[in-house]
């Protein structure tokens, strides 16, 4: 199989604008982790793309943007020469959905979630509505035309289609959240702050079943009203009573079209897990799966392309937690 891997930020998606350092660093981490796994698979010939402002990737075939070529055109060129494409991109602005649709439009194999599933999970409000309709516990999510309940405590205001902690703001109460929504009514949502450990799930989905690969602890810093993800402890939390595997199954049933690697952000409250958002793509936790579990997650994903394959559901391996730092050498 000829496979084209496209990491949007480090792979040319910002070729016509300045590279955002934090996003480029995180994207490069995910890309290198995935390429290392793919490099072990017989019969898989991988090509990627590279922003020429970044160091080259030794031993990896990479294409670079041509004069005037934007990220979408670069992706189309790479996918056209391959049998399958694996896009990794922020959901923001519909970027990931557009890449997925282009892949299928070209008649190529998409190693990722369906465009419709990406479109749904891109919107935090739509995701919350879909999960709530299926009885999955999730954080209440409000837009500018909703009446915010006067719940005590701080609230979070964020872009409805945001990725990670980008532009996430913590405000002191529901009134401040309401005012923030009014200031930018088209793009923002507000959610009450949920107390409890910030965790995430790494899932393997096939559109029908789901396998819980790991439960990860997120090390989050809140300062000056800004929320920052500083590090992740991959496979640092055990699913002792099976409630997290059960949550994964309920999410997969509620959101058809999730396929391949999927991330879930949630808070573990005293009443149980509460979902914050679904990431229909590789997340940074992927970078620690090999060290923590001794598995090749890329092999598991591509194995789902084989005829009559189905995801198995063994419990997460015990393993040893792996620590993935998102801080730069400058400590940001």
Label every PLM stretch briefly.
Residues 1-22:
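Nucleotide-activated donor-dependent transferases that construct or modify glycoconjugates
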Residues 18-38:
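Short catalytic helix/loop segments, enriched in acidic residues and glycine
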Residues 37, 47-145:
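Conserved N-proximal alpha/beta basic substrate-recognition cap immediately N-terminal to
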Residues 117-198, 204-213, 217, 231-246:
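Active-site nucleotide/adenylate-binding loops and adjacent lid/helix of ATP-dependent enzymes
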Residues 192-256, 268, 279-306, 323-327:
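ATP-dependent carboxylate/phosphate-activation module, predominantly the ATP-grasp catalytic core
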Residues 258-270:
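A short glycine-rich, hydrophobically flanked beta-strand micro-motif that places a catalytic Asp/Glu
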Residues 272-274:
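Conserved protein kinase catalytic/activation segment
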Residues 308-332:
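Cysteine/selenocysteine-centered motifs that mediate thiol-based redox chemistry or coordinate metal-sulfur cofactors
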């Amino acid at each position: 199989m000829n496979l084209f891997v496209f990491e949007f930020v480090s792979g040319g998606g910002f070729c016509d604008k300045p590279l955002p350092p934090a996003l480029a660093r995180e994207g490069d981490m995910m890309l290198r982790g995935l390429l290392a796994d793919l490099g072990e698979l017989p019969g898989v010939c991988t090509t990627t793309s590279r922003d020429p402002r970044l160091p080259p990737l030794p031993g990896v075939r990479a294409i670079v943007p041509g004069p005037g070529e934007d990220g979408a055109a670069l992706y189309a060129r790479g996918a056209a020469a391959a049998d399958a494409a694996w896009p990794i991109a922020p959901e923001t602005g519909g970027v990931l959905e557009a890449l997925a649709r282009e892949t299928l439009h070209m008649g190529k194999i998409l190693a990722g979630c369906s465009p419709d599933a990406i479109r749904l999970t891109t919107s935090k409000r739509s995701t919350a509505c879909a999960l709530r309709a299926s009885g999955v516990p999730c954080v209440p999510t409000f837009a500018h035309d909703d009446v915010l309940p006067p719940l005590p405590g701080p609230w979070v205001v964020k872009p409805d289609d945001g990725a990670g902690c980008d532009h996430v703001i913590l405000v002191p109460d529901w009134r401040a959240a309401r005012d923030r929504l009014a200031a930018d009514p088209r793009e923002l949502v507000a959610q009450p702050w949920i107390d409890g450990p910030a965790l995430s799930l790494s899932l393997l989905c096939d559109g029908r079943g789901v396998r819980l690969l790991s439960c990860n602890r997120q090390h989050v810093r809140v300062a000056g009203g800004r929320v920052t993800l500083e590090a992740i402890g991959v496979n640092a939390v055990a699913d002792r009573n099976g409630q997290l595997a059960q949550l994964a199954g309920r999410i997969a049933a509620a959101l058809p079209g999730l396929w391949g690697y999927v991330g879930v952000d949630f808070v573990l409250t005293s009443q149980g897990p509460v979902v914050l958002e679904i990431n229909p793509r590789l997340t940074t936790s992927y970078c620690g799966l090999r060290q923590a579990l001794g598995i090749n997650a890329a092999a598991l994903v591509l194995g789902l392309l084989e005829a009559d394959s189905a995801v198995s559901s063994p419990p997460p391996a015990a393993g040893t937690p792996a620590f993935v730092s998102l801080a730069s050498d400058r400590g940001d």
